[in-house]
Design a protein with these regions (language model features):
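Gly/Ala-rich beta-loop-alpha elbow adjacent to hydrolase catalytic centers
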Residues: 172-176, 180
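Short glycine-enriched nucleophile-adjacent loop
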Residues: 180-189
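Alpha/beta hydrolase fold serine-hydrolase catalytic domain that processes acyl esters and thioesters
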Residues: 1-25, 30-92, 96-112, 116-121, ...
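Catalytic cysteine-centered active loop of the rhodanese-like fold, especially the PTP/DSP P-loop
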Residues: 167-169, 182
Length: 422
């Protein structure tokens, strides 16, 4: 029966990396671990201090600080305890931590380096945390290139690998996955050669021009992109067909939570592809964003941030703690938006619904055509039986299918061609 990353740790947590190399599920555990609040516990990347093990952190009197994000407190606590319980992660070393939240630059950036027992490194970028500034930076990716967090990620990789010279993995969940891919594209060429794999766990992609400018094709063979069945975040600006889809025990947007991803033995439960209905929605969203000019996107994002900031909450925890107060502030702020901006917002939203409507219509037409072709094929199949030749023996009466089975095989220098190849 399939479980989650927590069950994986119970089963394989005692096998060291020198016996069982890092796999996709390990990457999820480490990327999620980067969400914990290691401030003051792990050496800052700017100070080049000593490393510390998980065991040493667990013994600190302020260990409860790790679970400051109450949204995932229960899951993060189970993850931490699961990592501590076995040899695989217990003595893993942590170093080069950084956590920046800069309101004036509209950026939230956090990263940490894990040193595994086989000597390899895993550089993990935190995804969007509970800060409202962090969510604003996510939206900024729609029109800014690069956003400050992406620039920081490149500096981080070059700095850490300048001190630690081992081969390394790099990864992140959500925005962290975007930062992992971006930093791999833009880091120094001699550093890039040491990258083993790049993990993007339901991380958003990039505008087409960014992929071209940053030479994504130079690293694409090392990218492991994992998406849940109903992925939306990870399909933003997605132009890379090389992704894998994993099953989740949650539904809809809640599948973005990596603790919901299903694991069997030491691997994820893979499924065929994103749900078709979700694909249509994702295509509409991407087409909509790319159809807007920079001024429209900037106005939309800035107004949204301005309205939410009117609640005076610094993070989502505070925003939702007094939901009524926050929403009253939002409604008041919306009323104060000037007429010109309000009209632009209405036009932007109308265009989203129009594109979505067209996408659904196109899909319905395509479905009808497919069904029509299928019916015609079935009718044609029945008519294709070869009629008996009066001059031939009764035993010679065959259908096309049986004729193919009895056809002589090519021998000598001839080879049978494979379907779909010329």
């Amino acid at each position: 029966m399939a479980g989650t990353v927590i069950e994986y740790l119970k089963k394989y947590g005692d096998i060291p990396f020198c016996e069982k190399p890092l796999n996709d599920v390990d990457s999820l555990a480490l990327c999620q671990l980067s969400y914990l609040k290691f401030d003051g516990m792990v050496s800052d990347v700017r100070h080049n201090g000593p490393s510390v093990t998980l065991q040493e952190i667990a013994k600190r009197p302020d260990v409860e600080q790790l679970f400051g994000d109450v949204r995932f407190e229960k899951e993060n606590r189970a993850l931490f305890e699961g990592l501590l319980s076995g040899r695989r992660f217990r003595n893993m070393k942590l170093n080069c931590y950084i956590n920046l939240v800069e309101k004036e630059w509209e950026t939230q950036f956090s990263a940490i380096t894990f040193i595994l027992d086989d000597g390899t490194l895993f550089l993990a970028f935190r995804g969007t945390d509970e800060t409202i500034v962090g969510w604003k930076e996510d939206f900024n990716m729609a029109f800014l290139n690069p956003v400050p967090g992406q620039e920081y990620s490149v500096k981080y990789v070059n700095m850490v690998t300048g001190w630690l010279h081992q081969p390394f993995y790099i990864g992140g969940h959500s925005k962290g996955g975007n930062l992992a891919v971006y930093s791999a594209m833009k880091c120094a060429p001699f550093v890039r050669k040491r990258i083993q794999k790049i993990y993007s766990l339901d991380g958003p992609g990039f505008r087409p021009e960014v992929l071209k400018e940053c030479h994504y094709n130079a690293i694409e063979d090392k990218v492991v992109k994992l998406l849940p069945h109903s992925s939306m975040i990870g399909m933003i600006f997605e132009r890379d067909i090389h992704y894998r889809v994993v099953e989740s025990k949650n539904h809809g947007l809640l599948q973005h939570d990596p603790f919901s991803w299903l694991v069997k033995d030491d691997h994820f439960v893979d499924v065929g592809d994103i749900y078709e209905s979700q694909k249509i929605m994702n295509e509409a969203l991407n087409e909509w964003i790319l159809s807007l000019n920079e001024e429209q996107v900037r106005t939309f994002v800035d107004t949204l941030y301005q309205v939410i900031s009117a609640s005076q909450a610094d993070d989502l925890i505070t925003f939702t703690a007094d939901w009524k107060k926050s929403m009253n502030a939002v409604v008041t702020a919306l009323k104060e938006v000037d007429d010109q901006t309000a009209e632009m917002l209405r036009g932007i939203i109308r265009s989203l619904f129009e594109i979505a409507r067209c996408k659904v219509k196109e899909e319905l037409i395509a479905t009808k055509k497919t069904r029509h072709r299928f019916k015609n094929t079935k009718r044609a199949g029945k008519a294709e039986e070869v009629r008996p030749d009066p001059a031939a023996s009764p035993d010679a009466t065959v259908t096309q299918g049986s004729a193919a089975r009895h056809a002589p095989k090519l021998r000598g220098n001839h080879r049978q061609g494979r379907p779909g190849r010329s």
